Each structure stands twice: as structure tokens, then as C-alpha cells.
Amino acid sequence: VKPRIAVIADSPDEHWPSMDLVAEMLVSEWQSHFSSEVETEKLELPIPHVTRAVRDSKAALNVDRILGRFVRYPALALRERSHFDFFHVADHSYAQLVHALPSRRTGVYCHDLDAFRSILDPAREPRSLPFRMMTKTLLAGLQRAAIVFHSTRETGRRLEKFVAPHKLVYAPYGIAAEYKPDFDPNDGADEALASLNGAPFILHVGSAIPRKRIDVLFDVFARLREHMPELRLVQQGGALTAEQNDQARRLKIDAFLLQPPKMPRTTLAGMYRRASAVLLPSDAEGFGLPVIEALACGAPVVASDIPTTREAGGEVTSFAEVADIAGWVAATLRLLETGPDGRVQKARVTHAQQFSWNMHARVILNGYLSLQSPQ
């Protein structure tokens, strides 16, 4: 009998593209290529509109998010616990759900350790007592799970300090079909980039949260423009803070910064293909999906020299130390001045092709099949 596995996804109202992607790809692969072995269904809920009904503010949204994660989602888990053979919590920041599910039949995908930093490294991320109590609930849920998946060897190594090693399974991400080197005049990128009027640009894909180091990105771009005044910066996915906007104005780069609205994967792939370089200056990443997406499109990449992006980018990616502005400028200029190279581009694409959502889905399915008790 085929097992029934529920994939519990983040609320779509969270607007975390990478988390939405991993849940989408897993369900899609299981339904498209593994339907003879598994039945699956994605479970997700909107963020409740409770506190915001009284006062619409960021603080109210955060309260509603907590209500969603710690009240509505656990209630959903309790209702569904008898309807599936296994439960896959697609994002570790929802690991509190393990407490409402049969732990021996529940797994969690741990993408990074950021959600646990306030208790694992309180000096680096001091938080309030209520926040730390919620975080402890998350960590306890992760530890209770029967199986914990992770995307990089480095994350697995760090997880071994507080999760039983026999529970850990390495299941790296994949590349969506849209990310490929073939030029497509109908991908929508030309329209999205029309205001650049054909100027060369560097691309950053990701949010504007602190660990993404938008400050470094802006400093590097300002220095690059001293060498290449025609250069532009395209940032996709970040809602800039007042401080970041102030920095852009102070550096006099705000007029050369383009932030298109959220684009479909087809258009984002076109933006990767047209970019002179893709930069990822984060000081921490669970994996660094933009690295392999860009490489799959043949784009040159400069990433922070941290273990996880080293794993993702391999020898076909350029690296610079975190926040070393001069190092970043030098590494990026080398790529910009070298120009396109068919042999190097092919090597990038070949490297990226080792990452497969099909294999990702296969590994995760095998993990749950291994939990099945003999009948």
C-alpha cells in the first residue's frame, strides 16, 4: 500500500519564496514522478486576521503570525494526524508542529540554524524571554522528529550537536526547469529591465534581512561604479529598510538601483542570464539557492566565502570574505573584465546540474519509507 504523506508548508502569507519553492517542488515531484510509490497532499493555511482587525501594523502582523504558527497550524495538525501515514514539515521554523503530530511518523526539513540562534548563540542574537521560549519549543520539536533533512553537509555537521546523528539525512535542493542557459526572448526579462536601457548590471536575489548584508552589496556596487560608471544594480526580492534606503542615497547609488516587483521563475531566469554578475554577500546561508540558480543559467557568481555557499558554488564560483569590500570589488571586477567565456559558462551549468529536485524528492521519500514498520 502506498504511504500517504502530508507536506506541511509555510503559510503563503509569510512570503518566503525559498520556503514556498521547496514545498512546491517536493509535492510536484512526488505527484509527477513518484505517484506509484506515494500519495501526497500539501497542507497550508493563511495567516489569521485577528490582531490586524483591530490595528493594522507590523506588530499586529507578527502577533497574527504567532497565532497562525502556534494555534491554527497545530489545530490543523491535530485534525489531520489520523489521515496520513507520515508528515513532512517543510520548514524547521514550523517544527513546533511535531508536538501536535505522531513524532515517530513526522520529519522536518532544517534549512539553516537561524531560527535557533537566540538559544544556541544568545550573545550574537539576544532576544526576549517569550521569544526564546518559542524558540525552545521549535528546537524541542525538531529534536522529537523521527527524521531531519538538511541541504548541506555543513548544516548537517552543525545539527549533530543537538539532533541525534542517526536521524539526519542529506537532501540538497534542486534546480527548477526554468533555470537554464538558453536565451529566451519571451522570458519577460527585457520588459522587467527596460528602464536600464541596455546598461550592464549586477544582480542580487534575496530578501533584505540583516544576514543578507545589503549594506555590503551597496558598498561594493558604489565602488564598482568608480570603475564602471555605466553599471547598474538590480535587486530582486528585498523590501529595503529606511536605513538601507538612507545608505543608497548617501552613496549616491539610489538612481542606479532597480527593484522589479516579484517575478515568475521564467523571468528571473532571464535576469540571471542577462546579468554581468550575480552577487550573494550574505554572512550566513543555509544553502544559497541563488548561487545554483544563477550557475544553471550560466551566470558568473561571487558569493561570501562561507561553508554552505562553498558547497553550493564549488570551483565555478568566485568567493570573497564576508564584508571585505575591497575583496568583493576585486573579485567582481575580475569577472566583469574577463567577459563571457563559453567554456567557463558550460562548466557553471554542468556544476549546477548535479542539483536535482527529482533526487531531492527521491531522498526524502526514501527517508520516510525507511520509517515504515514491517507489516
Where are these regions (language model features)?
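Carbohydrate transferase catalytic cores enriched for Leloir-type hexosyltransferases
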Residues: V1-Q375
